[in-house]
Each structure stands twice: as C-alpha cells, then as structure tokens.
C-alpha cells in the first residue's frame, strides 16, 4: 500500500493536512490512525467532555513520572486515541494564542511563523460565529461559536473583572486578547466540532484519501530518507510507503517517541536502548511544556449553578434533549466566560488565563462539591519549567517516560500565589455579592505563602496542553528538530507538524494553534507560496509598563 503522502495521526494537525494536501486531487493521502471511530454521544455531546478523557477506549493513558516538586504526584496526560485525536476528547475551548506568542516563535528561529504570517491561516481555517469583523475567518471548515446558556454567573464574572479594573474584550481571538469576556467553543449545531468533523470526514469522501487503522511502530528509512511507515494491525506487520513524504502528527508525546524509535534523536539515549542512529538530534523529546491550573471554588447562595443538574434524572433529561434536538445543557461545554490578564506591570501581554465554570467540580468530572457553587480555573501561561519525553525501551508498545518537571522553577510558585490571590480579589467584587457564599477551595484558612504553596502542591492539575518536544527552529540550532518548513533536520522526506513543534507554548488552549500548524504546514509541503502576510496590528495595553490592568 502506498500514497504520495502518509500522515501519522488524525488529530488536530493531521486532519487539517489530510484535507489540504488532497483538496486539488493531484496527490493521494493515507492517514494512519490507531484509535477508534469518534461515534456516540460520549464523544459528540459537548457536555459529556469529562467521559472520553477518562476512558481507555479513547485515551492513550499517559501519565507523568512522579513529579518531585508537587509532592511526588503523577499527573495524567490525556491524548486522544480516537478519530480526531485530542480534538475529540478536549474541552472544546478555542483560543488562537496571543500575537506576541507567534512573534516569539519567529524571533527564536522559526522564521515565517510570526503573527503576521499565521493570522491568514487562522482566518482560512475558521468559520467564526460572532467574532470581530475583519479579524476572523467566516468560510473555513472549523466552526467556532459563543456559548448560548446565558447563566447570570457568566456575566458576573466578566463584570467582576471590570470592577477590579481589568479590561473587557468582546473577542479574545480578535484584535484584543487582554481582558474578561465570552469564551469561544469548537461546537456546531450542538455537536463537538472536532478536527475529524471539520476536516477529516470531508477529506475521506475524496477518492484520493484513505484511512488505515494501525499502530505506527517506526519510520522506514533508506539511508537518510524516509520512505514509509511500519505499522502493526492485529498481529500483522506491514509497511505503508510514501512516494513523496511521511508526515508525523502523532502528538507531543508520540511524535518524539516515534522519531527516537526510528533512530532520530539524542545519540546517547538511542545507544542506551540499542537503536541504530540515523540522525543525532539532541532536541527530540526535550523542551516539554504544559499549562498548569488550580480551581478556586466558591459556594453559590442562589440555585442557579449546574449542581442541580448533576443528579441522574436531570442528566437523563439533558441527554434525551440533546439526542433529539442537539440543544440544551448537553449542547455546551459550559465554559462560556473567560479572561486573559497580565500579572504585573512590565508584562507586555497576558500571562494568566481564566476559565469560569458555573459549578464546583473537577475538570475530569470527578469530586463534585456537595452544594451549589462556581469556580475559576486559573494558571500562568508561560511557565519556566521544562521537561522531557524519553524512551522506556526500544519496544514501540511501551509508553514513554514523561517528566514535565512541573513547578521546578521558583518563578512558577510566585506566579501561582498571585493567581490564587488575584482570583480571590475578583470573586470579592460587588458583581458576585448576590451569589457569593463561603470559599470551598482553597478555604479561608489558606492565606500565607506557605499555606498557598501547600495548596498548590496538593491540588495543581494539568490543563492537558503538552507541547514543544520536536521544537521548530533554525537549522543551525542544535536543539531544533524541524526547520521552519517542518522538515526534520538531517532526514529527507520526513516532517513533523503538530503541537510538538511549538518552540514555546502559546497563550491558551492548544487545539486552535495545532490546527493552524496543519494548515500552514500543508502549504510548505505542497511547495505553495505562503498566504500573504497580514498588516493588522494587535492591541497592546498602553499601560503595560506601569500597571497590571
């Protein structure tokens, strides 16, 4: 079996590339996916988001090694093992990232990936419902909407931010990210709008696109050229050959793992596992980054939260309405207001993100509070801690060793202390007076630096945004894995295009920029002239040097 292009992974970037590489009919594409079909309400119902990320059926089941700086806790790292990859198990929050994120990419060696370069690709991919005119795309495959439940707590959160002196923004994906405002969702007609729904399923209707179910074991190389992929399907091993190129889009965990199993990575590490060296790229698996967050929870004095809808009868009613009409509380992820703010004067653009939720519960659906409540998920966006993904053995079936080194930099602790205190300030504003009860978490007894640090150590959680393990950079950067056209340095016919190539993590959730990577990489792969650069200038707070708001 062979095709012009072989893509490993049907996730956010992989699905976008399958769509774009095949759209003019000139080239054939095979997408290799080990996961299951994305069928059923547990995947497609937005409100059921906590289920697929906790199910072996849909998730690779990765966890970090015990993390020494957070009390030896091992945090889960869900990655989608399903059509659509992690876009089929994520929280459906849509964030492009800040313009300065991409300018930093370009300045660090990923030339051609500045905000002016990537904005046209965000516009090409979007079908934005209600975003800022002129800044958003309206004809792309990816539907993006605002929340529709209109809970008064969403408005209270935005108003509280305003009362605290922060900016308000009507579209954080437009000209102005900074501020409090409505959150955007990848939901369409009441259904999760994953990369599979947006890109892959339309592409699979074309005669030149084929989906192959199989477990990718390694890249097949002839000398220093990639010519195919060895896959395992059942008990059968076979090679899918690529006439032009192999493209890895297997996630920030599996992409570096696959490179190393194929002899591309740190020479000493590969030798340790008896793997023949093809290209010594010390950056493979390094530079691992993530977003962490804590949940600040308050009791609510009015019965307007989702607590009353957590019982079996209400869940059944919500499920029936969604199954019949794709409306109601089942048709949203319930993240409908958000904020991006700066932590202090001298910070040029937001470095803290908020998700607001009208219930007190864990993100994975476990440990709901036993009363009406609401919460903010809050965390710093630019942690200085860095980790790694390495091989446990040369057996492709073994999970890799994942070490995030969470909270290993002292600045991360100071940033989180500020997040806790800032959230208390916001929840203390007059807008919440009609609703605010006692603090559930951390609790009124947690006040000093040491007490807050202990709370963070015990309760900090991953936002599930791993990235950076196949860093994109200049060819002469010894830690770069791919060049600015996503080509693996030192190997021909092989590219990586997914969140693993991010030089530095972006502001916000990663599904949006991962799809953008797939869109832009497609033009590089096809040898097309990139879309014309934008001349639009993003808003930067004129007070950034003297104030945090």
Swiss-Prot record:
Source organism superkingdom: Bacteria
The cross-references to PROSITE patterns, in alphabetical order and at most eight, read:
GMC_OXRED_1 (PS00623), GMC_OXRED_2 (PS00624)
Give the Gene Ontology MF terms in alphabetical order: betaine-aldehyde dehydrogenase (NAD+) activity; choline dehydrogenase activity; flavin adenine dinucleotide binding
**Species the sequence originates in:** Brucella ovis (strain ATCC 25840 / 63/290 / NCTC 10512)
Q: Tell me the residue numbers annotated for binding FAD.
A: 4-33
Instruction: Read off the InterPro entries from this record.
Output: BetA (IPR011533), FAD/NAD-bd_sf (IPR036188), GMC_OxRdtase (IPR012132), GMC_OxRdtase_N (IPR000172), GMC_OxRtase_C (IPR007867)
The family this protein is said to belong to: Belongs to the GMC oxidoreductase family.
Q: What does this protein do?
A: Involved in the biosynthesis of the osmoprotectant glycine betaine. Catalyzes the oxidation of choline to betaine aldehyde and betaine aldehyde to glycine betaine at the same rate.
Q: What's this protein's name?
A: Oxygen-dependent choline dehydrogenase
For this protein, the Enzyme Commission number is 1.1.99.1, 1.2.1.8
What cofactors does this protein use?
Answer: FAD
Name the GO terms of the biological process aspect: glycine betaine biosynthetic process from choline
User: Could you tell me which pathway this protein works in?
Assistant: Amine and polyamine biosynthesis; betaine biosynthesis via choline pathway; betaine aldehyde from choline (cytochrome c reductase route): step 1/1
Q: List the active site.
A: 465
């Amino acid at each position: 079996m062979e095709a012009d292009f072989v893509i490993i992974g049907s996730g956010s970037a992989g699905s976008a590339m399958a769509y774009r590489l095949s759209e003019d009919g000139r080239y054939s594409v095979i997408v290799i996916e080990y996961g299951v079909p994305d069928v059923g309400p547990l995947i497609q119902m937005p409100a059921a988001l906590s289920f697929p990320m906790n199910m072996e059926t849909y998730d690779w089941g990765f966890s970090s090694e015990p993390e020494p700086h957070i009390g030896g806790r091992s945090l889960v790292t869900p990655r989608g093992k399903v059509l659509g990859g992690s876009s089929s198990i994520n929280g459906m929050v849509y964030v492009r990232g800040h313009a300065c994120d991409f300018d930093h990419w370009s300045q660090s060696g990923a030339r051609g990936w500045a905000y002016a370069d990537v904005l046209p690709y965000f516009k090409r991919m979007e079908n934005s419902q209600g975003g800022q005119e002129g800044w958003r795309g309206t004809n792309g495959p990816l539907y993006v909407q605002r929340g529709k439940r209109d809970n008064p707590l969403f408005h209270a959160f935005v108003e509280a931010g305003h009362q605290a002196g922060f900016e308000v923004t009507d579209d954080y994906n437009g000209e102005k990210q900074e501020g409090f405002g409505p959150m955007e969702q990848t939901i369409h007609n009441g259904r999760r709008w994953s990369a599979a729904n947006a890109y892959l399923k339309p592409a699979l209707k074309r005669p030149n696109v084929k989906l192959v179910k199989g477990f990718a074991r390694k890249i097949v190389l002839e000398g220093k050229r990639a010519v195919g992929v060895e896959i395992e399907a059942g008990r059968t091993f076979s090679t899918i050959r690529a006439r032009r190129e192999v493209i890895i889009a297997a996630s920030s965990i599996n992409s570096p793992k696959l490179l190393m199993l194929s002899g591309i990575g740190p020479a000493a590490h590969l030798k340790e596992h008896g793997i023949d060296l093809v290209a010594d790229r010390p950056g493979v698996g390094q530079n691992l980054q993530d977003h962490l967050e804590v949940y600040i929870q308050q009791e609510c004095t009015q019965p307007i939260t989702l607590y009353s809808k957590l019982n079996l009868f209400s869940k059944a009613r919500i499920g029936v309405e969604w199954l019949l009409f794709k409306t109601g509380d089942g048709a949203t992820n319930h993240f409908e207001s958000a904020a991006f703010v700066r932590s202090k004067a001298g910070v040029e653009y937001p470095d803290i993100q908020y998700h607001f939720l009208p219930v007190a519960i864990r993100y994975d659906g476990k440990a709901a509070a036993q009363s009406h409540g609401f919460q903010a998920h809050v965390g710093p966006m630019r942690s200085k801690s860095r980790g790694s993904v390495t091989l446990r053995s040369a057996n492709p079936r073994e999970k890799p060793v994942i070490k995030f080194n969470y909270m290993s930099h002292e600045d991360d602790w100071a940033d989180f202390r500020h997040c806790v205190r800032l959230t208390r300030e916001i929840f203390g504003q007059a807008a919440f007076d009609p609703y605010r009860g006692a603090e559930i978490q951390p609790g009124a007894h947690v006040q000093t630096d040491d007490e807050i640090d202990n709370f963070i150590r015990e309760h900090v959680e991953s936002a599930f945004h791993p990235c950076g393990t196949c860093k994109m950079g200049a060819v002469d950067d010894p830690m770069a894995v791919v060049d600015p056209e996503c080509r693996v340095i030192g190997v021909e016919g092989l590219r990586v295009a997914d969140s693993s190539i991010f030089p530095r993590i972006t502001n916000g959730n990663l599904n949006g920029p991962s799809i953008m990577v797939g869109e832009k990489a497609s033009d590089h792969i096809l040898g097309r002239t990139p879309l014309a650069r934008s001349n639009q200038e993003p808003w930067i707070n004129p007070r950034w040097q003297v104030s945090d708001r």
